[in-house]
């Protein structure tokens, strides 16, 4: 998938009708289109990065910090929330652009 075809790249460039719940220079966060809980936000780098193993350490730190900020803004930081990265097809990664799920608002189980 090229950057031009990547839906998350299109979202991060503002080419799709998606409202950001949080954004910084290098990342954006928006509500999942198919939420699995009352709060289900995706945090993505603006740069097209496919796998978590390819993320520079400074950007990874920004992404993790953003998950905390999103959880606080969405009101789930105190009650609890899950942070999940699906890395590769076997893990369930459906879009080949790194994204971190922030999920909460109800009791969650595994996986």
Regions found by a protein language model. Name each.
Residues 1-111:
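HIT superfamily nucleotide-processing domains
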């Amino acid at each position: 998938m090229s950057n031009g075809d990547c839906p998350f790249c299109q979202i991060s460039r503002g080419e799709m009708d998606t409202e950001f719940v949080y954004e910084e220079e290098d990342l954006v966060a928006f509500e999942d289109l198919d939420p699995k809980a009352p709060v289900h936000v995706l945090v993505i780098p603006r740069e097209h990065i496919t796998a978590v193993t390819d993320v520079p350490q400074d950007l990874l730190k920004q992404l993790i910090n953003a998950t905390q900020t999103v959880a606080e803004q969405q009101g789930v930081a105190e009650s609890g929330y899950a942070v999940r990265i699906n890395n590769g097809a076997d893990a369930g990664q459906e879009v080949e652009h790194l994204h971190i799920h922030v999920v909460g608002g109800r009791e969650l189980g595994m996986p």
